[in-house]
Amino acid sequence: MNIAAVQKTCAPLLRPLGAAYAACMAARRAAYEAGVLPRFAPPRPVVSVGNICWGGTGKTPLVHWLLRWCGAHGLSAAVLARGYGAKPPQLPLLVRPGNTAAEAGDEPLMLARQNPDAAVLVDPVRRRAGHWAEAHLAPHLYLLDDGFQHLAVRRDLDIVVLRPVDLTGEWGRTIPAGSWREGTSALGRAHAFCVKAEPDLFNALGPQLERRLVRYGMPVFSFRLAPRGLVRVGRGLDPRPTEQGAATRAHLDGAPYVLVTGVGEPAQVHATATHFFGYPPLRHRIFPDHHPYGPGDVRQLAGEGCAVVCTPKDAVKLAPLCGEGAGHEGTNQPDLWAFDLVTEFGPALWSATSFPEWWAARWAGLSAARRV
């Protein structure tokens, strides 16, 4: 079912429902702000990375970037994540690299494996996870992954990630009329906006950015996920390209490949792959976001007869299903590779500094105020 097509066809009926939904979310927000509903308010800074819509926008890569920044500056961080679709053996779950995606969720597991020195906690009740982290870890900083609407945790900074379509056709279209979780007034809580877009697209969005976001008086940064190469995916292989045991390659040298994605924005991954390799995939196998891959999926991929490329988010679920001989002839295993992605920041609006410089300045202010 094409949800967007249904929403467009039924727009006259759905708009009033969307307005009612936005009003309910605004009332909920007011209840938290008035202290009617309880909030976890730790003594250390809390930074939320979230979005206004459902689905993938690039939140988790930004959380990963912040974790790497914290590690480089000698700061401990605790991520409070919901763990979409996860079934943790206990709550909260302190995610370890050895956990499975079924236990922790694909994105928390990816963060834990990419940042083994960070604490990634999964619990749908993030207030509970925060209390546990404060009692057992006392980190310098809390990061809320997908936290914009999770108001049960007080935050010092809200970084809101937007898609280009949020600035055009989806602007202000709340559920069920569109994909937004809240109305436009909610963006007034943001301290910065990050738009996942290539520099050329970000610059082309200038008129929409001016019309939509100037009223909030906050900086707007662009970013993209840029592949640096490929990392072999298989059981027992380290997913981090710089670590011992990781098999890497810079390119496919013009060989054909199949792209497989179980993410929120598969078209963006297709465009990234086409740009990186210089040619499109033979096929693009698109699965739903957070798809729980099974042995049947792996058998299909093994039958492709060429390299199969996926995202790091897909890799954490596919790796356990692939033997240690993955990719070797005669093993009946797919020749599976994942992109080694790096977050790159591009042009900005209403800011004299880049996002890393802006963040460093904001952290200096937060840490001084909280005496971190």
Swiss-Prot record:
Binding sites annotated in the UniProt record for ATP: 53-60
Any one Gene Ontology molecular-function term assigned to this protein's record: tetraacyldisaccharide 4'-kinase activity
SUPFAM superfamilies linked: P-loop containing nucleoside triphosphate hydrolases
Reactions catalysed: a lipid A disaccharide + ATP = a lipid IVA + ADP + H(+)
Alphabetical keyword list: ATP-binding, Kinase, Lipid A biosynthesis, Lipid biosynthesis, Lipid metabolism, Nucleotide-binding, Transferase
EC number(s) stated in the UniProt entry for this protein: 2.7.1.130
Pfam families: LpxK
Residue ranges that the Swiss-Prot or TrEMBL entry lists as coiled coil: none
Record-level GO cellular component terms: plasma membrane
GO BP term, example: lipid A biosynthetic process
Pathway noted in the entry: Glycolipid biosynthesis; lipid IV(A) biosynthesis; lipid IV(A) from (3R)-3-hydroxytetradecanoyl-[acyl-carrier-protein] and UDP-N-acetyl-alpha-D-glucosamine: step 6/6
Function: Transfers the gamma-phosphate of ATP to the 4'-position of a tetraacyldisaccharide 1-phosphate intermediate (termed DS-1-P) to form tetraacyldisaccharide 1,4'-bis-phosphate (lipid IVA).
Classification via PANTHER family: TETRAACYLDISACCHARIDE 4'-KINASE, TETRAACYLDISACCHARIDE 4'-KINASE, MITOCHONDRIAL-RELATED
Family as reported in the entry's similarity comment: Belongs to the LpxK family.
Protein name: Tetraacyldisaccharide 4'-kinase
Lineage of the species this protein comes from: Bacteria, Pseudomonadati, Thermodesulfobacteriota, Desulfovibrionia, Desulfovibrionales
Gene: lpxK
